[in-house]
Design a protein with these regions (language model features):
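Membrane-interface alpha helices of multi-pass inner-membrane proteins
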Residues: 147-151, 173, 183-199, 209, ...
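Transmembrane-helix motifs of polytopic, lipid-linked glycan transferases
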Residues: 114-133
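Short periplasmic/luminal acceptor-recognition loop of GT-C membrane glycosyltransferases, typified by
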Residues: 390-429, 447, 451-459, 484
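Transmembrane-helix signature of polytopic, membrane-embedded enzymes
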Residues: 127-149
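Transmembrane catalytic cores of multi-pass membrane glycosyltransferases
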Residues: 58, 70, 126, 199-294, ...
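Extracytoplasmic
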Residues: 352-417
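Short hydrophobic alpha-helices at membrane interfaces in multi-pass membrane enzymes
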Residues: 140, 144, 176-192, 226-231, ...
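Membrane-interface transmembrane helices that cradle and orient dolichyl/undecaprenyl
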Residues: 168-184, 289-294
Length: 487
C-alpha cells in the first residue's frame, strides 16, 4: 500500500513517465521518495502545530457571537453584552463564528481545536496549490511549508484562519490569470464567502488590482482583456456589499482600525525582532536573490506582488501572514528556476493523493483534539465557582484580554471592556488604560463603571493598587489571575 501512496503522491509533481526516463529532459529528476516524504512532513508538521488546547483570548467572544447569530439572526446594532460600549457591534465574521458555535454545542471545545487544525490543513493545501502554479511539487511544498511557518503567529482558533485560506486561493488564482490572461469569475462569489467570514477580504481585491497593474506595465493587456480582468475585483466588491451586513461592511475595516491601531498590539507596526516577520522577509529575500542572480528580466506583476508582500509584512503584526502567503508562490517560482526546468502541470491523480493524505490527517486529528482540548488553556477555570456565586448583572473590572472569556464563561456578569475595541469610544479605552496602568486620575474609571469585583492578572499594577489603596480583598487565584472584591 505504501508503494501505491508513494507513486500517487509523487504524481503531484506532474512528471510523466517519459520525462522520468529521459535525463536529457529532466536532468534533476527527483527521487521517487522525495515528494511523498515532503508531503507527509508538511502535513504532520501542520497537525502538530494545530492540535493544542483552546487559548486565544478572542475565541470566547467569537463563540458567543455565533450563538447570538443563531438565536437572533442580527448582524449589527447595539452591543448586547457590555453596556459601556457606545458604538454598534457589526458582525463581520459571523459565518465561521456560527460554524464554531455549532461544533462547540455538539462536541465541546475539542471541536473548536479540531476546526483550527482542519483550517490549518486547508491553508497548507491552498498554499501548495498556489505554489504549484509556479513550480513542481518539491519546491511548491517547501515554499508552502515556509509560508505556513510565516503565518505561525496568527494560527489560532479565530475567523482570520478562513481569511488566510481564501487569500492563498486568491493569490493562486491571480497567478494563473497572469499566465493565461483569463478572468476567474468565481473569485466574486468567493469574495462573498470571504466577506461573511473576516475583514481581510479587501486584500483579495488588492491582489487582483496589483496583478492587473503589473500586467499593464508588462504591456500584455489590450483594452478588452483589461476590462474583463478589472471586472473581477469590481464584482468582488459588489459581492461583499451583498452580505447580510449590507453595504456598511465596506467601511468596517477602517472603523475597526481607527481604534485598534492605538490600543491592540497586533494592529501596531511590526517588531523587527518578530520571528514570523523574519521568516517571511527571508522568503522574500531568497526570491529577490534569485532574481538578481538570474539573467532574465522579471515581469512587473511579480515585482508588484513582492513589493506588496514586503509592505504587508512590515505594516503591522496582523498582516505578517498576508505577506507570507503572497510570498509563497514567489519563493516557489524562484526555487523552480534554480532547477533549470519549466514547471509541470498539476494532475488529477496528484491532487487526489494530496487530498487523501490531508483527509486522513484531519480524521486522525479528531481523537487527539478530544484528548488535549477538553478544557481551556491559560484561563482561570478554577475561579468559575466563585464567579458563578456573584449576583447577576454585577460589574467586574476585568483584564483587557479576559473580557471575552468572562462573557463566555459567566454570561450573567458584566465586564467593563473586551477586545472588540471598535465598539468602545477612544476616550473610554484611554480611561480604562489609565486605570490599568494606575496613572493620575485612575480612580475616575471606577466611579464611572462602579465595579464590585475585579478579575485581573496577579502581578498587574492595578491589582496591587486596589489591594493597597482601596482595601479590596482576594476571593481566589488561578492561572495567573486573581479575583478581588470591593470593600
Amino acid at each position: 500500500m505504501s508503494r501505491h501512496v508513494g507513486v500517487a503522491t509523487a504524481d503531484i509533481a506532474g512528471q510523466s513517465t517519459k520525462a522520468a526516463k529521459d535525463t536529457r529532459i529532466d536532468p534533476q529528476r527527483d527521487p521517487r521518495w522525495l515528494v511523498p516524504a515532503l508531503a507527509v512532513l508538511a502535513i504532520v508538521t501542520t497537525v502538530k502545530l494545530g492540535i493544542r488546547p483552546v487559548s486565544d483570548p478572542d475565541t470566547w467572544w467569537h463563540l458567543k457571537t455565533g450563538a447570538y447569530v443563531l438565536s437572533d439572526w442580527r448582524f449589527d446594532g447595539p452591543d448586547p453584552w457590555v453596556p459601556f460600549s457606545s458604538r454598534p457591534f457589526v458582525l463581520t465574521q459571523w459565518l465561521p463564528e456560527v460554524v464554531a458555535e455549532k461544533g462547540y454545542s455538539v462536541f465541546g471545545l475539542p471541536a473548536v481545536a479540531w476546526l483550527r487544525c482542519a483550517a490549518m490543513l486547508a491553508l497548507l493545501s491552498a498554499l501548495v496549490w498556489a505554489a504549484r502554479q509556479a513550480a513542481d511539487a518539491v519546491p511548491a511544498i517547501m515554499a508552502a511549508l515556509a509560508g505556513l511557518l510565516g503565518t505561525g503567529g496568527s494560527l489560532s482558533e479565530r475567523p482570520q484562519l478562513v481569511s488566510f485560506v481564501l487569500l492563498a486561493i486568491t493569490v493562486g488564482a491571480w497567478w494563473k490569470t497572469a499566465g493565461d490572461l483569463r478572468p476567474r469569475w468565481w473569485l466574486a462569489p468567493l469574495t462573498f464567502l470571504w466577506a461573511c467570514s473576516h475583514g481581510l477580504w479587501g486584500i483579495g481585491v488588492l491582489i487582483g488590482l496589483t496583478v492587473i497593474g503589473g500586467l499593464a506595465l508588462d504591456r500584455r493587456l489590450d483594452r478588452r482583456t483589461a476590462a474583463k480582468l478589472l471586472a473581477v475585483p469590481v464584482l468582488s466588491v459588489a459581492a461583499a456589499a451583498l452580505t447580510p451586513v449590507g453595504p456598511r461592511l465596506l467601511l468596517t475595516p477602517f472603523q475597526v482600525s481607527s481604534n485598534a491601531a492605538q490600543f491592540v498590539q497586533e494592529w501596531q507596526p511590526t517588531n523587527v525582532r518578530d520571528i514570523f516577520a523574519a521568516v517571511t522577509l527571508g522568503m522574500i529575500a531568497l526570491t529577490l536573490l534569485s532574481w538578481v542572480r538570474g539573467t532574465s528580466a522579471r515581469p512587473w506583476w511579480q515585482i508588484a506582488l513582492a513589493g506588496t508582500a514586503v509592505v504587508c509584512t512590515l505594516a503591522m503584526s496582523r498582516t505578517i501572514p498576508v505577506g507570507s502567503i503572497i510570498a509563497a508562490p514567489l519563493l516557489a517560482s524562484a526555487l523552480q528556476e534554480q532547477r533549470g526546468l519549466a514547471a509541470t502541470p498539476l494532475t488529477r491523480r496528484g491532487t487526489r493523493a494530496w487530498v487523501g493524505l490531508v483527509a486522513a490527517a484531519a480524521i486522525g486529528a479528531a481523537p487527539i483534539a478530544g484528548a488535549v482540548a477538553q478544557r481551556p488553556s491559560s484561563w482561570p477555570e478554577g475561579l468559575r465557582p466563585q464567579l458563578a456565586a456573584i449576583p447577576a448583572k454585577t460589574v467586574v473590572l476585568n483584564d483587557f484580554s479576559a473580557g471575552g472569556w468572562l462573557m463566555w464563561a459567566e454570561p450573567q456578569l458584566t465586564p467593563v471592556i473586551d477586545l472588540r475595541s471598535e465598539i468602545y469610544s477612544m476616550d473610554y479605552i484611554r480611561e480604562y488604560r489609565r486605570t490599568e496602568e494606575v496613572r493620575a486620575g485612575w480612580q475616575g474609571f471606577l466611579d464611572r463603571t462602579k465595579p464590585r469585583y475585579a478579575l485581573l492578572k496577579t502581578k498587574a499594577p492595578l491589582t496591587a493598587a486596589l489591594r493597597e489603596q482601596l482595601s479590596w480583598t482576594t476571593v481566589g487565584t488561578d492561572a495567573d489571575y486573581v479575583l478581588l472584591k470591593a470593600p
